[in-house]
Amino acid sequence: SIAKHQSKTTIGAHNIFLGQVRADAIDSKTVSAIEYTAYEDMANAKFYEIREATFEKFNLTCMHIYHSLGKVNTGEICLFVFVSSPRRKEVFKALEYVVEEIKAKAPVFGKEIFEDTTHQWKVNI
């Protein structure tokens, strides 16, 4: 669907955020993956609310949000956010806003899995 944006001639800028799972060291253990779970209906409803609030706050033409579910290994992408606008400053501000809203409000839960197979629930900061 992103390729279709070429025909939208009022768009002057696109911005993309790719969230990637890091191999964080926590208490002498290294993260090897994060297993994401969600109440999908609730998460989709929250993504919709965030999307609509972002369209109200910023002059955007288009937005796409995709969050992984299941096991995502370190180095792999877990979150994709794409925004389009007539102006570049809008896409920079909007993208930061949307990512922070997702991190703070979306009911998506991450279980950090360590190399030794132990785990802990991730705290978003």
Give names to the regions the model predicted.
Residues 82-84:
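Short hydrophobic/aromatic beta-strand micro-patches
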Residues 1-77, 86, 92-125:
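N-terminal, polar/charged subdomain of small-to-medium soluble alpha/beta proteins
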